[in-house]
UniProtKB/Swiss-Prot annotation:
Function: Required for the pachytene checkpoint, the meiotic checkpoint that prevents chromosome segregation when defects in recombination and synaptonemal complex formation occurred. Represses meiotic recombination in the rDNA, probably by excluding the meiosis-specific protein HOP1 from the nucleolar region.
Lineage: Eukaryota, Fungi, Dikarya, Ascomycota, Saccharomycotina
Disulfide bond residue pairs: none
Gene: PCH2
Binding site for ATP: G314, P315, P316, G317, T318, G319, K320, T321
Subcellular location(s) of the protein: Nucleus, Nucleolus; Chromosome
Induction cue: Induced at the onset of meiosis I and reaches a maximum level during pachytene (at protein level).
A GO CC term assigned to this protein in UniProt: nucleolus
Protein name (Swiss-Prot/TrEMBL): Pachytene checkpoint protein 2
Length: 564
């Protein structure tokens, strides 16, 4: 079985380690004259390998049931592990000394036995994890997304296997060739940008700006504006976007705390998350493969259609936009499309540019399509700046039907030709940006049938997200209730004994989920159910766990009756 593990490192502890490496290398460079920054990065890479090895060893000790899709917080690890300690954020001076000392000891042991942790005792493991791990997110890979491996006999009979697949009318996504017998943990350490104090305004400005032609074409709508005066501060970074573009989009840097935990909180059937992630990763990998491959090979973009556009559609409130943003967070954490040589640093790994369709439209004729051209021109400059740095740019268009409506329908309704011009401009600009290996476009829609056929045809993958099933509702309730217990809103009496709330009330919550699923309720509405419950039946906090579950059942009954 294969597991993807996203390892969120405690930012304050990581800063102590980075500072220690810098101090050591500055002293060393005075004597040897070596590049202290390069040596410091190398040591940081060794430290992260050590951390991954310790986490892997810990996960291998867990029972199979716990390795299913779940989140393990640093607090849980601290409560469970003998030898763990709780540290402040940021650590005290004494705790910083402990962090430095333990890291040096374990790094020495780790390097002396060629990257193994067998000689490290469990107490050291637990102490190490409590100092450096903030959260571990575990995602079990579905069998349909594990690489296909054929044995010798299957290769000889390959034709027969293919005939049986093509002749079958059923779509079976769990064929027999996929599974391995040994557990595999693919671990991706990361630290959210907000947790790194080293961030300084303008820290990502680099010499790449000098390589870009600063003079923009006059017909691009900038009226003589150049990249020099298009550089603006957004958050902690300077990026080459004009003020006009910044008025039309929202910018998010990745990985960010805003999006952390969203991927795990979402539950969909048919492996939609895994499929969407696979499509996005392969799209970026194919583009990068062409860039880093043999210069004499034929352009792969002429052989494989890769428009860098994924479309997610479904009813309102099903989590389409959240899914897209969470996908980008995971891409920035796992970075499977990059060369994998970078360590945790203060630079962003990706940017989400969320296009506001409502702001794109103007009352002046021709201005709407001009706004789209300006935004895409700025995005192109941003792509050029980050192209060689392994940083991807995602354009997110929410409710894309506003700017990609069917031109046939617009013409038949005698709509203004400005709407048609907007669609034409959007398609042209998407075609223009697909050549960049670090570009990805995500679009969401509530009305797939209203979209222009040419836009839908450009999508490399079209994914339907419907209202949650009973299993999906159960997952949503579980996530919401766990947050309420953690925040102290619900008083769970058995928590001190190690019993999980979900284990105690599993049968009851499942019945509530089945009741809600009979009336086809959106995920957004289900997330409101605990708030409805508290508002209608309680006046003070915390609330008793048994009383909360009873009130939740009553609220579910009311909600179901109102939707019939």
């Amino acid at each position: 079985m294969s597991y993807i593990v996203d390892l969120q490192v405690r930012g304050s502890s990581l800063r102590v380690i980075k500072c220690m490496f810098r101090e050591d290398e500055q002293i060393s460079s005075l004597h040897s004259g070596s590049d202290s920054k390069q040596n410091s990065n190398k040591k940081l890479g060794e430290f992260l390998n050590l951390l991954k090895a310790v986490v892997k060893r810990k996960l291998e000790s867990f029972p199979k049931d716990r390795l299913k899709t779940s989140i393990i917080t640093g607090q849980e690890l601290m409560r469970e592990g003998q030898g763990s300690i709780e540290i402040k954020d940021p650590p005290t001076e004494a705790q910083q000394h402990l962090i430095r000392s333990l890291a040096k000891v374990l790094l020495h042991q780790f390097s002396s036995i060629n990257g193994k942790v067998n000689t490290v005792n469990e107490g050291q493991d637990n102490l190490f994890l409590s100092l450096f791990v903030k959260k571990i997110s575990i995602e079990q890979q579905s069998t349909s997304h594990v690489s296909i491996k054929l044995n010798f006999h299957e290769k000889i009979n390959l034709g027969q296997h293919i005939d049986s697949i093509l002749d079958s009318e059923e779509t079976n996504e769990s064929d027999t060739y996929h599974m391995g017998s040994v557990d595999e943990f693919i671990i991706y350490p990361f630290c959210c940008l907000e947790e790194q104090d080293e961030l300084k305004n303008g820290s990502i400005l680099s010499t790449e700006f000098d390589k870009i032609d600063l003079e923009l074409d006059e017909d691009d709508g900038f009226e003589g504006e150049t990249l020099n005066n298009c550089i603006n501060s957004v958050g902690n970074f300077d990026i080459p976007l004009s003020k006009q573009t910044l008025n039309l989009v929202n910018i998010s840097y990745l990985p960010g705390t805003t999006f952390e935990g969203q991927w795990e909180s979402l539950y969909f059937g048919n492996n939609i998350k895994e499929r969407l992630y696979s499509y996005a990763t392969i799209s970026l990998k194919i583009a990068r493969f062409k860039q880093t491959g043999d210069s004499n090979q034929e352009d792969i973009t002429t052989l494989i259609t890769n428009n860098k556009l994924l479309l997610v559609h479904g009813p309102p409130g099903t989590g389409k936009t959240t899914l897209c943003k969470a996908l980008c967070q995971k891409l920035s954490v796992r970075r499977e499309f990059s060369d994998g040589s970078d360590t945790i640093d203060t630079n962003y790994k990706g940017i989400i540019i969320e296009l506001s369709c409502a702001r794109i439209f103007s009352k002046w004729f021709g201005e709407s399509s001009k706004n789209i051209s300006i935004v895409f021109k700025d995005i192109e400059e941003l792509l050029k700046v980050n192209e060689g740095r392994g940083i991807f740019i995602c354009l997110l268009i929410d409710e894309v039907e506003a700017i990609a409506s069917s031109r046939t329908n617009l013409s038949s309704r005698n709509e203004s030709t400005d709407g048609i011009r907007v669609v034409n401009t959007l398609l042209t600009q998407l075609d223009r940006l697909k050549k960049y290996h670090n570009f990805l476009a995500l679009a969401t829609s509530n009305l797939l049938d209203s979209l222009d056929d040419a836009f839908v045809d450009r999508a490399d993958g079209v994914f339907y997200v419907g209202n949650p099933t009973a299993e999906g509702i159960l997952h949503i309730l579980k996530v919401c209730i766990e947050e309420m217990i953690t925040s102290g809103i619900i008083l769970f009496h058995a928590r001190s004994t190690g019993v999980k709330f979900f284990n105690k009330y599993q049968d009851i919550l499942r019945k509530i989920a089945i009741k809600c699923s009979t009336v086809d309720i959106s995920g957004r509405t289900i997330r409101k159910l605990p708030l409805m419950c508290l508002s209608e039946y309680f006046r003070t906090f915390p609330v008793d766990d048994d009383e909360f579950v009873l009130a939740l059942a009553m609220s579910a009954r009311k909600l179901s009756a109102a939707r019939k």
